[in-house]
């Protein structure tokens, strides 16, 4: 690891510490992710090798953070694995916060919301096309290149070898705000719809500059969702009452979605409602979302 000079710790990712570092030879800035992977005498576990090869494959998309290399080092006599990613200076949470807070609060420009949402759908479609779910999409792991106006998905693909924990090991609670109702209700058989739900929540948050469903526990999270969208029924979502954590919830009627996103044009509200369908099978796919009329005014040739 002499190849890289660590400049500063920039965060604790879901999977370990993240450092901003510089390649001593080229001066290129990189993000070093130190993984907490238990390596044995045999070296890197096969599950991790598989995940890394998936990451390599996925990072060929412009809208997924690029994995540059994998480095092995030794710390206290134990092997440590570092993943080396391209470095981006900010994330979508910080980007939205800059519009919400500070001396000059203002909405995000419509063209920026459209562009970022389109890029997010494109990145998610790329992952789903390779059979990979992200399962933890949130503004904090969407990295933004402000100069170029590019949004990239990070913290991806380490789903099985490095299971996404409920608590990150810094004991911060992993946020539930973007989690799909089937996951909150204990479904173990989930599919691409879990990511689309998260994309819908992120879309609404760019428009509102605050979270759509800010729950602080799994139950509170469900109640936030049910109060806005109505308590789901078997007609709407066959099998919902058989899910592990289903209870007799209070019966709420659906509210008008437009009121939560008053500045959003009708096509945008339509797309949002297609992402926030209760039945995962009825949620729009990332690929179909890219063809939605909401994006008709966007110059797609740039992507």
From Swiss-Prot:
Binding site for ATP: 10-18, 33
Any GO BP: signal transduction
Superkingdom of the source species: Eukaryota
UniProt keywords, alphabetically: ATP-binding, Kinase, Nucleotide-binding, Phosphoprotein, Serine/threonine-protein kinase, Transferase
Pfam families (UniProt xref): Pkinase
Modified residues (Phosphothreonine): 14, 170
GO terms under cellular component: cyclin-dependent protein kinase holoenzyme complex; cytoplasm; nucleus
Domain Protein kinase: 4-295
Induction cue: Down-regulated by sucrose starvation in suspension cell culture.
Modified residues (Phosphotyrosine): 15
Active site: residue positions: 136 (proton acceptor)
Catalyzed chemical reaction(s): L-seryl-[protein] + ATP = O-phospho-L-seryl-[protein] + ADP + H(+); L-threonyl-[protein] + ATP = O-phospho-L-threonyl-[protein] + ADP + H(+); [DNA-directed RNA polymerase] + ATP = phospho-[DNA-directed RNA polymerase] + ADP + H(+)
Group of enzyme by EC: transferase
GO molecular function, one term: ATP binding
Residues annotated as transmembrane: none
Expression by tissue: Expressed in actively dividing cells: root and shoot apical meristems, and young leaves.
EC number from the UniProt entry: 2.7.11.22, 2.7.11.23
Family listed: Belongs to the protein kinase superfamily. CMGC Ser/Thr protein kinase family. CDC2/CDKX subfamily.
Protein name as catalogued: Cyclin-dependent kinase B1-1
Protein source organism: Oryza sativa subsp. japonica (Rice)
């Amino acid at each position: 690891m002499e190849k890289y000079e660590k400049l500063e710790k920039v965060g604790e990712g879901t999977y370990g510490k993240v450092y901003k570092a510089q390649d001593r030879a080229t001066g290129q800035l990189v993000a070093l992710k130190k993984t907490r992977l238990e390596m044995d005498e045999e070296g890197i576990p096969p599950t991790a090798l598989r995940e890394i090869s998936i990451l390599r494959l996925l990072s060929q998309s412009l809208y997924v953070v690029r994995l540059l290399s994998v480095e092995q080092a030794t710390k206290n006599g134990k092997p440590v694995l570092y993943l080396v990613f391209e470095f981006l200076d900010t994330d979508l949470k910080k980007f939205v916060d800059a519009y919400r807070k500070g001396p000059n609060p203002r909405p995000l420009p419509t063209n920026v919301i459209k562009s970022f949402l389109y890029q997010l759908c494109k990145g998610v479609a790329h992952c789903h096309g390779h059979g990979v779910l992200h399962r933890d999409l949130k503004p904090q792991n969407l990295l933004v290149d402000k100069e170029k106006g590019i949004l990239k998905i990070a913290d991806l693909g380490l789903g099985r070898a490095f299971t996404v924990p409920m608590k990150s090991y810094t004991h911060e609670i992993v946020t539930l705000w973007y989690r799909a109702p089937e996951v909150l209700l204990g479904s173990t058989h989930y599919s691409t719809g879990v990511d689309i739900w998260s994309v819908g929540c992120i879309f609404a948050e760019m428009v509102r500059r605050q979270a759509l469903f800010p729950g602080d526990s799994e139950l509170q999270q469900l109640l936030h969702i049910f109060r806005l969208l109505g308590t789901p029924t078997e007609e709407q979502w066959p099998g919902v009452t058989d899910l592990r954590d289903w209870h007799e919830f209070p019966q709420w009627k659906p509210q008008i979605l437009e009121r939560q996103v008053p500045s959003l044009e009708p096509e945008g509200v339509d797309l949002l409602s297609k992402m926030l369908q209760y039945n995962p099978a009825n949620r729009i796919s990332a690929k179909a979302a890219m063809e939605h009329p909401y994006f008709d005014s966007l110059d797609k040739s740039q992507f």
